[in-house]
Amino acid sequence: MLVRSALGVTCLAVSLAAGIACREVVAPERPRTSTEADFQALVDREWNWRLTESPLFASSIGDHRFADRLPDASLQAEDRRAQDTRAFLDELEQIDREALSAEHRIDYDMFAAQLRERLEAHRFKEHLLPINADSGFHTSFALMPQSMRFASPDDYDAYLARLRAFPAYVDQHIQLMREGLRTGMTIPRAALAGVETSMDALVVDDPERSPLWAPFARLPSTFADGERSRLQDAGRAALRDDVTPAYRRFLTFMTDEYLPGARETLGASELPDGRAYYDWLVKKFTTLDLTADEVHEIGLREVAAIRAEMDTVMRQTGFTGSFDAFLRLLRTDPRFYPRTADQLLKEASYIAKRMDAKLPSLFGRLPRQPYGVAPVPEYLAPKYTAGRYNGNPPDGTEPGYYWVNTYALETRSLYNLEALTLHEAVPGHHLQIALANEVESVPNFRRYSYISAFGEGWGLYAEWLGLEAGFYTDPYSNFGRLTYAMWRAARLVVDTGLHAKGWTRQQAIDYLASHTALSIHECTTETDRYISWPGQALSYKMGELKIRELRRRAEESLTGRFDVRAFHDAVLSNGSVPLPVLEQIVDAYIAREQGT
């Protein structure tokens, strides 16, 4: 999975013309109409506005024009951005959509959907929730050096300007969260237990122990000695006098004010206008016109089907006891857990390299950007999930990273590791996102968007694809794959249960614990994530079900002419798209193949 990014670069489901144009086909150049020129000018203007308003996002995609700034996170700025977005949408609606080419009609619809999503997010006051159970603005700031350029003294001075601006940035977020306390728009208290652990490594007396010191520890050797001393002295001062006190102030606010005042209810439906908010989240994160009840029922059906598979695989291990006894065995037998962090990282790296060798048989196009395997940063690890993909700017200066959580090794099961690695690294998030960054024929607002139902659905499909690639030959590993599949199916039940059906936190933990082989620690951290990030967990299974449905359609339509490499290239050729758009892309691919 990926962390939420600035300005909500996701997209709701959109209705598109039936004749969708797939951009992997190069069409002859055609004169651009004045309507298309007006549309492109608006898109370009909004994109530049977006980067100006979100300089951290700009840095993350390799645009360093605003590298000395942090976003304005004040309440006034949030309201102003909503007004600007409304003005962009009003201007867009004055453009005659039908006068655009088929490709630009797709762009029009997706652009409109992004603008409307931002307005809805502001209407529901999502900006008053700048943190969740395992991350937020405070942890993202500590990751900032990964997306910045450090080639010249000017680059370092820009970084120093951001460090010095951090106290005001923290105060703005405290203002947002105080407004949330006043209006009842808060993260549930239960999901924030232990949140202070994510700040322990950020509130440091020695500046050189801060993760934000890293750029000063690797100053280029080409810098003059005097310049190196100046920058390091300035870095120590900024971390000591600005950053650490701001983190300490935020920690005090969290423990003394926010946690005691946070709501005791769990579900998003308990927030102001909460039922409408959760209904919107279901549609946002699935990109489908479904209700919470419909998603819940789909989840129950998937849970039952996967459980039958799990029973079969359990018997293949030679185990003769009950399902619950088998889960206890998996959770307690030391052979299923790494002894050291190095062992876990080496196992994950080996799985990733094995899959690297399989990629040419499954994909026609492979990305240029490499990836590495690394531990989850220490300050994030206690409340973090088992693994996550962390992308980097697509300019080729840094690889992407598959992060593996080496905290609490007794909870990091090895039988799940093949599925986790295929999801987060290749052929999952790294491959999908790196390829999307290389699609130059779509506008930037699409190229750098991340639609959760597509991205997380692809990640779960990538786990399943491991069967075809020769993974999961060990029955315990295959059970781990099914545990992950069950986990995502159970999310449909648990997320809707928590946010639409009044489930308790313990009820959600118990449901995960009784249906998967996840450790109790993972069941707990996952539940807290669902509580604090409502709707997002629905993306995975709903997206995977749609991709597998479309693959079956292609196989049945093309029979002997079906080429899995061409199918995967078609799915990934347009970047991140809503599921209804993906369906039309695949239908267009099938029609082309049938015509050859």
Which stretches of residues belong to each language-model region?
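N-terminal secretory signal peptides that target proteins for export/translocation
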Residues: M1-V3
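Bacterial N-terminal signal peptides
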Residues: A6-G19
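N-terminal maturation segment of proteins
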Residues: C22-T596
